[in-house]
Amino acid sequence: DKILLAEVREEATYVKHHKKKIVLLFSAMRHFAKALSDDGFDVIYRRYDDDNNQGSLLNEVKYACSQHSFDKVVVTFPGEYRVLKSMQQWQHQLGIPVEICDDDRFIASLEQFSEWAEGRKQWRMEYFYREMRKLTGLLMEGDKPIGDKWNYDQDNRKSLPADVSPP
């Protein structure tokens, strides 16, 4: 098994991003790749400035497939619908099976959210999160939220004190 991580132009430029955001994301990817490698995983890492960078996720996967004999490609369910729609075509484009696995980094699955949203006239995420917190026990003390407040939106709307500079 190999793990492919790729910094690609398509993902960095599909909408205008602040340069510092792109630097943060690429830095996080590089640190994650190193951690995986240090843990013994076989990592293929494609930097944005690599001479042979293919420019898109699909093209990087195609290139990796041309360099190695993979039986299938396994990806994590992406956080963006446009990426999901692209990945759903990869099996046809690559000629090998593509498995899209659930992303367990979220508090709920897409199915759980769909079930919650069905029949509701208004989707207020705060109420969904309350249900998920009760279900999972996250940030809960018994059946009450930690600190007896469901959210701190009012506190988050306050201006940063003048004597504090952001990092």
Spans of features found by a protein language model:
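Catalytic cores of large soluble enzymes that bind and process phosphate-bearing ligands
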Residues: 21-24, 28, 53, 79, ...
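Acidic-and-aromatic substrate-binding clefts and catalytic sites of carbohydrate-active enzymes
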Residues: 49-55
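Beta-rich, aromatic/charged-enriched effector core domains that present basic-aromatic interfaces
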Residues: 56-167
